[in-house]
Amino acid sequence: MTTPSHLSDRYELGEILGFGGMSEVHLARDLRLHRDVAVKVLRADLARDPSFYLRFRREAQNAAALNHPAIVAVYDTGEAETPAGPLPYIVMEYVDGVTLRDIVHTEGPMTPKRAIEVIADACQALNFSHQNGIIHRDVKPANIMISATNAVKVMDFGIARAIADSGNSVTQTAAVIGTAQYLSPEQARGDSVDARSDVYSLGCVLYEVLTGEPPFTGDSPVSVAYQHVREDPIPPSARHEGLSADLDAVVLKALAKNPENRYQTAAEMRADLVRVHNGEPPEAPKVLTDAERTSLLSSAAGNLSGPRTDPLPRQDLDDTDRDRSIGSVGRWVAVVAVLAVLTVVVTIAINTFGGITRDVQVPDVRGQSSADAIATLQNRGFKIRTLQKPDSTIPPDHVIGTDPAANTSVSAGDEITVNVSTGPEQREIPDVSTLTYAEAVKKLTAAGFGRFKQANSPSTPELVGKVIGTNPPANQTSAITNVVIIIVGSGPATKDIPDVAGQTVDVAQKNLNVYGFTKFSQASVDSPRPAGEVTGTNPPAGTTVPVDSVIELQVSKGNQFVMPDLSGMFWVDAEPRLRALGWTGMLDKGADVDAGGSQHNRVVYQNPPAGTGVNRDGIITLRFGQ
């Protein structure tokens, strides 16, 4: 299935502006309102997948509910009917601009002032979204645009969820491999998320626009996700010169691992950004520099040593006291020695035999993306082995289950096999051409497919009621859960012949081409029309015929004139009039007719009748009154 060039007879699609994980965005023209728009269309290969179809519709619902100047507006939604089924689309405001990702990649880090202004506007957009019950869940530089007028626009609520539905992991609705650098720790663990998760992701974006790189990078999404959960970010000022400690404080508070330690709303984060922009200290705690940290530790160490005291005066001991003192010291030395030996023995035992193992319950990671599931299991101390399997119910790169199974108690450090879905089993579509629909269903069922839909399409007469193709096509692999559209021949397409009388042959043929007719013949006919002009067709205009029919164009010889009304005229007046029209033929004067005295010698009968075509060299019959 391909994307049509027009949607709902209103939107004319133009160039592709970009691609997403499940859609493509076109520049389009709204033919009704005469304005440019951006149209997001679900990828044709995903349109038949119910999970992607529902997710795309959820994006439309979420985005349409958000009317804010810093959020890309949604104008319309709909579904285009195609031979393969409905194709959903979203019509959005067209923003002529660039994304933060493109700006950082081409121009490098922003100035602190500009970065604060941009992210503060993004905070307003997200706060509005959160107040309306929608968490974005995929905040990243590629989803924030700067328009040609420097307006900030947050877009792509493709995996957004209502807050009431946020108990599900982000990865239960979309793979996050492409956005691992902006995941919150709770997203990386597969825990439930709330508005503070968007705050963390926006903190990652602020970090990147200030320094030119995200807070965490790695060789794989799993390693990046692990850092989000376990590692502290390097302060931005240590990555890029010219950044203040106050700006460090705002960024690092947004990037707090524990959501309770972050800004609780995007509005709080914006308020601190405004303070820093105005030269005021933020409410976020200041981050100590290395020098300040060293000075503080040195001061603390000095306080722990305590005030200096003078030594006690030495006292002389007698022999008994001296022996008692020596004996006491000896006993304490022995005790300390024994404890030291025990410590060494216990340490060796732990290192040698692994110490006391503890049982850990295997978490339930079914339905999570493989990256999130692996991070969750590794955080529990498990070793991981992955095994890929086809599955009709779990999306690709998401977890089918684990071995041992979820909620099983195992020893910490054990190996867990993570069964990762490759999606529904793929099989080859057999060729069912020329079969009946029932025969085609039987053959496709034997090949492992189980969902079918019939579509009719014009065909040659001999293929009426026979299969002329499938979608997906024969010999192409497809998921066994996909609907196979069986296209049955309905015979030649039919059209009504339009009226082309009065047109030249070339113009008439072009107009007939518009209706689908391509086969023509010509016949010269007597006609008063100018020579070469079409007088009609055979079959006549208005007749419904197959589009592959031969249409005969009847072309005027230009050899006739229209017979005038000669009634009541004397012959001496009638003849010049006929000659003036080009008549060169003979007069057939019939017997006079008794028509009363007033009609004496006047025309009382003519053949051909008035208004009909007469050959210029033809015979005209007239009768006169007596």
UniProtKB/Swiss-Prot annotation:
Active site: 138
Keyword annotations from UniProtKB, A to Z: Acetylation, ATP-binding, Cell membrane, Kinase, Magnesium, Membrane, Metal-binding, Nucleotide-binding, Phosphoprotein, Repeat, Serine/threonine-protein kinase, Transferase, Transmembrane, Transmembrane helix, Virulence
Keyword field contains Nucleotide-binding: yes
Disordered: annotated segments: 299-323
UniProt KW Lipid biosynthesis keyword: no
Subcellular localization: Cell membrane
Phosphothreonine modification, residue list: 171, 173, 294, 309
Consequence of changing residue 40 to M: Lack of autophosphorylation. Decreases affinity for FhaB
Residue stretches making up the Protein kinase domain: 11-274
Phenotypic effect of disruption: Essential for growth, it cannot be disrupted. PknB depletion in M.tuberculosis results in cell death and aberrant cell morphology, and leads to complete clearance of the pathogen from the host tissues using the murine infection model.
Domain PASTA, residue spans: 356-422, 423-490, 491-557, 558-626
PROSITE patterns: PASTA, PROTEIN_KINASE_ATP, PROTEIN_KINASE_DOM, PROTEIN_KINASE_ST
EC number from the UniProt entry: 2.7.11.1
Residue intervals passing through the bilayer: 333-353
NCBIfam families per record: PknB_PASTA_kin
Protein name: Serine/threonine-protein kinase PknB
Species assigned in the record: Mycobacterium tuberculosis (strain ATCC 25618 / H37Rv)
Lineage of source species: Bacteria, Bacillati, Actinomycetota, Actinomycetes, Mycobacteriales
Name of the coding gene: pknB
